[in-house]
């Protein structure tokens, strides 16, 4: 199930703290007017440790812990149990870990959150990373399915296992929303406001278009975090919605 969101557009935008040192991330998050959600990825988590989740929550922020767990079921379950205890409201796992692992992490996350007195997080399954292009996926990983087939197949696998949503490119959001109505969460990176550089994302869309396509929440990084005025950039993205 998706996290509870208000009607405020600010609740729809998750700002990625990628590429920031811990102190920088905390200062940045504290000074973006109206910010509600932040994403903690691998780089920041490895550098700062689990404490960064608590520190961001102390600032009144909601945390998307994007560590993309992918391992054997027992290891994934243990990691999700501990991540849920931190109070992160969104946690990512790789759908291609398989149904056994997906079922295990759902149970473990609920147990970890309950033991720590935290609400159960929404688990998000990663389908196909937005940096992949179809030709590379087939050539380098020998996956015969095209992206248009693989993404919905992995989303269905995840939903059947009880996972609360998935991470997908905004280009796949409309098809997935037709397959999985609310409250199944669709969180979309690869969001680029008009005029923003595409960077290392291969499948991108604007904020308003992504929401119209069925996305629940949008992950936006550099167009806000690297802006001359991050508060103004965040407000502009909210205004687009």
From Swiss-Prot:
Gene3D superfamilies: Aldolase class I
Active site per the UniProt annotation: 68
Pathway it works in: Pyrimidine metabolism; UMP biosynthesis via de novo pathway; UMP from orotate: step 2/2
Family designation: Belongs to the OMP decarboxylase family. Type 1 subfamily.
SUPFAM superfamilies associated with the record: Ribulose-phoshate binding barrel (SSF51366)
Gene: pyrF
Binding site for substrate: 18, 39, 66-75, 130, 192, 201, 221-222
Assembly information from the UniProt record: Homodimer.
Biological process (GO), any one: 'de novo' pyrimidine nucleobase biosynthetic process
Function, as annotated: Catalyzes the decarboxylation of orotidine 5'-monophosphate (OMP) to uridine 5'-monophosphate (UMP).
Pfam families on file: OMPdecase
Name the UniProt record assigns to this protein: Orotidine 5'-phosphate decarboxylase
Its EC number(s): 4.1.1.23
Swiss-Prot/TrEMBL keywords: Decarboxylase, Lyase, Pyrimidine biosynthesis
Top-level taxonomy: Bacteria, Bacillati, Cyanobacteriota, Cyanophyceae, Synechococcales
Cellular compartments per GO CC: cytosol
Top-level EC class: lyase
A GO molecular-function annotation: orotidine-5'-phosphate decarboxylase activity
Catalysed reaction equations from the record: orotidine 5'-phosphate + H(+) = UMP + CO2
